[in-house]
Every structure is written in C-alpha cells, then in structure tokens.
Amino acid sequence: MAPLNFDLSSVPDRKSWCAQLVGRQTSRKIISTSEQFRFCSSIIYDEEYLSSRKISIVQYLLHFLMDISIFFLLLCLLQTLSLSSSNTLDNLRGTSLSVEKPSDKLVSENGEFSAGFFPVGDNAFCFAIWLNKSSTPTVIWMANRDEPVNGRGSVLSILADGQLILTNSLGITIWTTKAADLTSLEPEVTNLQLQLQNTGNLVLHNSKDVVIWQSFDSPSDTLLPQQALTMMSSLISRKGQDDYSSGNYKLFFDNDNVLHLLFQGPTMSSLYWPDPWLEDPGQAGRSMYNTSRRALLHDSGYFESSDHFQFNATDFGVVTHRRLTLDPDGNLRLYSLQKMNVSWDWVVTWQAFSDPCRIHGICGPNSLCSYDPVSGRRCSCLQGFKLKDQTDWSYGCEPEFSIPCNHTDESSFVLLAHAEFYGSDIFFYQNVTFQFCQEQCLNRCDCNGFQYNYNEGSGYYNCYPRYLLMSNEWTPITKFCWRFLFKTTKSRYFS
C-alpha cells in the first residue's frame, strides 16, 4: 500500500499547524510553545529529502509522536517513584505501606520523626512513630502494641470511608481507627492524605486540611509538647524497656476530675497518685471542680492540668525535644533530649516519685520494697515466701507453707516493725486493743496479716486486718507507731 501523504501547501502556517498537533499531545504543558515550534521545525523541512527517502510527512509525525509518548511515560514513572519516597502519601485510597519494604515509611519534613513498621521482636512488627535524633530510636506511639504482626504480607492502608486499617498476612484486621463520616464533604475534597508532622503527630486529613484522625488523640505511653491529655485519652506504660506491650500503670482523669496514676496488677488495682491516704485531693493542691479534664505539656517544659496540678522542668526553656512518659516502673517522668559528647540522650528533668517504693505494685504481693539513692530500688520476698514469677516482680511472692483456716494453736504472727502494706483492708476497727485485732485476723481464713497503728490525731490505736499484703514501703527509720504482723505457722522458723 502506498504511504499516505498530506499536502501541507494548503496549510497557511505549517509551524502553527504542527504546534497545535503536538500541543494536543502535551496538554499537561510540560513542553512550552517555543519548544513545540522547535520540534515542528525539525520535522517540516526539505520535502525533497523526505521524498527521496520515500517517507511521508504523516509517517514522520507518527514516529515523532511515538517518541513523545515514550517520553511522557517515563516522566510519569519518575513522578510515581518520587511520590512513593516522600513523607506524605496523596490520594491514599487503595494505597498502603508494607512491612516487607523498610523504605515504606513516612518521614517528617524536618527529618526527625519517622512512622512505619518498627521491629519489636523476632519477626514481630508494630506500626509506630519514633524519634530519629536520639542515640537509639525512641518510640513515642504504637498502633498495635499488644498484637504485633509478622514480617510478611502485613500492610497499613487507607479505606475509602476514611479509616486507617492494619491487616496481617491473612488479611485479618489487627488495628483500625474509627470510621470517619465523610458524607457531608463534597466529592472533590474527600481525597485523603496521611502526613507525619514536625511535631510527631501523624495526621489523616482531606484536601481542605480537615482532620479525620490523628495520633495525638490516642497516645500510648508518651505525651509530646502540644499534645493534650483529655478525658477521652490516657497513658498506659509498657511492660519493660524492650517489651512494648501494655504494662500495669495508667495515667488518666478519673470521675472526680483529678489526674491520677493507677496500678492495674494481676490480682488487684489501686490508685497511688496523688497519695491515696489523703482524705481530699485538695490536700495535694488538686481541684475537683473543673470538669474540662485536660492537661498539656508546653515546649518550655511547663506542664499544667485542669485540676490545678502543674510543674516546670529543671531545664525550663526551649530545648530540642521533650517527652512525658509513664515508664514501666510506674513513675511519670519528663525527659529532655540533650547532647552528651557526640550523641543525643534523654535526661530526666522531672519525676512524680523520688522514692520508687511509694509506687504501688512495684514489688508485688507478699514482698518488701527498699530504696537507697545510691544502689536504687530492691525487692525481696517476706521470709518463708518465694518469688512467684522469676521474670516479673508484679506477681509478687507466694508462701512456702500452708496456713490452717480454722482458729488453732498452729497459727502465729511475725512482726515487721518498719513495713507498711497498703489497701486490701477487710475491716477497720478504731480504738481497739492489740489482742482484739489479732483475734479478728485469726478467726478469718482470708486474713493474711494486720496493721496495728497509733493515730496521733485521735489518740487511738487502729486495727486493719488485710487479705492481701501489697508492699508499699519499708524504711530503716523506726516508726514506733507502725506495726504490721503477717500470719504464718508456728512450725516455721524465722530469724
């Protein structure tokens, strides 16, 4: 078949005709008009040359436009690669981050925070946010801390209804945010974007910057500056320095509008901050009358709460980074990132407890807690008891003997002169004798000991039979008005 030939003599301006033709292929206007003219000038030249080569103008143009199409295809591929490596993912519907790709992570614009799959064990990962600047990465938030996923097939995705969803290799949902109501938004503004901000906040928002979800609303064990703790949120400690699963301690606003620390142990739970022996939180400077229940850490290191609790960091002022963390030992600490020689490390600039033995559950039931500023905290079992779990002191100690339930001569008591055990009172008897208190405990199968104390205010001796011996504090300072006796058998010998 003879090649098709266009008679260009009928076109008054060949360059304009060619520019229009190429312009249709370059609607994205990546190629300027002058460049279009140069392209056309390069192909509309000596017709005798084309005729001698038996090449029609149409064939030449088709070959030229094919080259242009390949160019645009390569350009689109480059743009896609650039998008996948940026710190934001645009139009995330159907887009995901994979645990199998270490490069699949979000990075804040300042480069100091990252969000992605963080290793928490052998073939175990959690979707997390961490700070890169410290000598070792510091995790500040986790989505699935209690249910890690394996290293194959797990992905974080954004669904069309505005949910973030984490699925494992079997497609089972491990973690998800609450579905957002996007029905009120116009279709053209429902394009979603997941962005890690310079504050460490991971935000899912639409094209009008309406926040659909943010990590600041659901903290793990850490608060960052400008991140509010509210009646809808809490801090939950991790189990250990290298165990990111939920631990035994919680910071939250209780129904009395006061910010509390709570111990949630295997066998019991108890409030331990503010001091539980205070009859009124007002004695600790707290107010129960502000119902807003909101606390905030400022960049300067100033912390304020709606219950009037407040403090300043020892290095008050602007520093590189701060974090308020409920640590695995139940102590609430404020840290600042400081340069130590060549590395950046965290330094404690405030803590709720200087004596860790005042923290409930730190040593578990049937144990004693002692603290020395030099050697630190030490847990030990009561004599005749043994550690229940060699890896976790929160389970406490268990007796190596059995106590008869009925009132017999086989039961006896051992005096602990400087120890105090908190909570778990069976009864409270005021202005009674020591013998009466002892008889009450002997007559009850669930009584494992009793506290017999002198109250200076009333001038009475009070009796507290207890069913659980949760250690609070042991001190070498003799407090003659403190006496605790725990039940044992006469056949046991205690030094």
Cite the ranges covered by each PLM segment:
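Beta-rich ligand-binding surfaces for carbohydrates and other polyanions
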Residues: 59-495
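Classical eukaryotic N-terminal signal peptides for Sec-dependent ER targeting/secretion
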Residues: 1-15, 21-76
